[in-house]
From Swiss-Prot:
One of its GO terms (cellular component) is mitochondrial inner membrane. Residues 1-33 form a transit peptide. This is Large ribosomal subunit protein bL12m. Belongs to the bacterial ribosomal protein bL12 family. The lineage of its organism: Eukaryota, Fungi, Dikarya, Ascomycota, Saccharomycotina. The keyword Transit peptide applies. It is found in: Mitochondrion.
Length: 194
């Protein structure tokens, strides 16, 4: 059978099974194009005039590079006197959110108990885990554990361990940091928490 005959047959079959626009109901078309599940809702009715000053700031910020944005954030934190809050690797902790709010005025207008909090030394809850050294006899086990902790390849983990002293993880919660330290010390490594 030649290609020409095969093409004619497949084209005639396609023409017979093709759905024409007249066969599609108008309900299907309107449902498809008016569906809110696939498109974002339109807020054209709720458009408020934007101050040109704000519009210009938005335009300028949206054109910044990542480094420029980081500089902007740091400068705003300095100018607005916003404290640096470090988040642990495990995620959001409710205690960490309230820790920086000691001197913020309450809804009654009273200042927080900032003097009382400054008198008590704060217990450190976030640590940096540092691999100081390791026992050469258990080097392979330490490499395997570091590989699992950091998600590195075997070669990367070997280079990492051999470059000790080196920081393993930063901003680790106290419990996790102690677990990592105990695990690595059981394998013959010397680990410090900072």
């Amino acid at each position: 059978m030649s290609l020409r005959i095969l093409a004619k047959r497949s084209s005639s079959i396609w023409m017979k099974t093709r759905v024409t626009p007249a066969l599609i109901s108008p309900i299907t078309i309107t449902t498809r194009f008016n569906s809110t599940t696939t498109t974002a809702p339109s807020h054209k009715d709720d458009v408020r005039p934007v101050d040109p000053k704000i519009s210009k700031i938005v335009q300028d910020i949206s054109q910044l590079t990542l480094l420029e944005t980081s500089s902007l954030i740091n400068e705003l934190k300095t100018v607005l006197n916003i404290p640096e809050i470090s988040m642990p690797m495990g995620g959001f902790m409710a205690g960490a959110a309230g820790a920086g709010a000691g001197n913020v005025p309450s809804s009654t207008g009273e200042a927080g108990s900032g003097a009382e909090e400054e008198a008590k030394p704060e217990a450190k809850t976030v640590f940096t885990v540092k691999l100081d050294s390791f026992d050469t006899k258990t080097k392979a086990k330490v490499i395997k554990e570091v590989k699992g902790l950091l998600g590195l390849s075997l070669v990367e983990a070997k280079k990492f361990v051999e470059a000790a002293p080196k920081v393993l993880k930063e901003n680790v919660a106290k419990d996790d940091a102690e677990k990592i330290k105990k695990t690595l010390e059981d394998l013959g490594a010397k680990v410090s928490l900072e």
